């Protein structure tokens, strides 16, 4: 189990517990419950690159305490 930090453009930080082998799509579902919005409206970036739903967090080198940027579509 890892904890990922998600930051939106307004300075809000959200901590999300997940597994490294979760897909980005799975991660968005967990995050959407905390945000109260549809997973399809969430866009996540790491280092300026948009994360694709079918790829795992591990493949994007997302580990414990990694920071992701949150945007809304």
Swiss-Prot record:
<dbReference type="InterPro" id="IPR000626">
    <property type="entry name" value="Ubiquitin-like_dom"/>
</dbReference>
<dbReference type="InterPro" id="IPR039732">
    <property type="entry name" value="Hub1/Ubl5"/>
</dbReference>
<dbReference type="GO" id="GO:0005634">
    <property type="term" value="C:nucleus"/>
</dbReference>
<protein>
    <recommendedName>
        <fullName>Ubiquitin-like modifier HUB1</fullName>
    </recommendedName>
</protein>
<dbReference type="GO" id="GO:0045292">
    <property type="term" value="P:mRNA cis splicing, via spliceosome"/>
</dbReference>
<feature type="domain" description="Ubiquitin-like">
    <location>
        <begin position="1"/>
        <end position="73"/>
    </location>
</feature>
<dbReference type="GO" id="GO:0043687">
    <property type="term" value="P:post-translational protein modification"/>
</dbReference>
<dbReference type="InterPro" id="IPR029071">
    <property type="entry name" value="Ubiquitin-like_domsf"/>
</dbReference>
<dbReference type="GO" id="GO:0000753">
    <property type="term" value="P:cell morphogenesis involved in conjugation with cellular fusion"/>
</dbReference>
<keyword id="KW-0833">Ubl conjugation pathway</keyword>
<dbReference type="Pfam" id="PF00240">
    <property type="entry name" value="ubiquitin"/>
</dbReference>
<dbReference type="GO" id="GO:0031386">
    <property type="term" value="F:protein tag activity"/>
</dbReference>
<dbReference type="GO" id="GO:0005737">
    <property type="term" value="C:cytoplasm"/>
</dbReference>
<dbReference type="GO" id="GO:0033120">
    <property type="term" value="P:positive regulation of RNA splicing"/>
</dbReference>
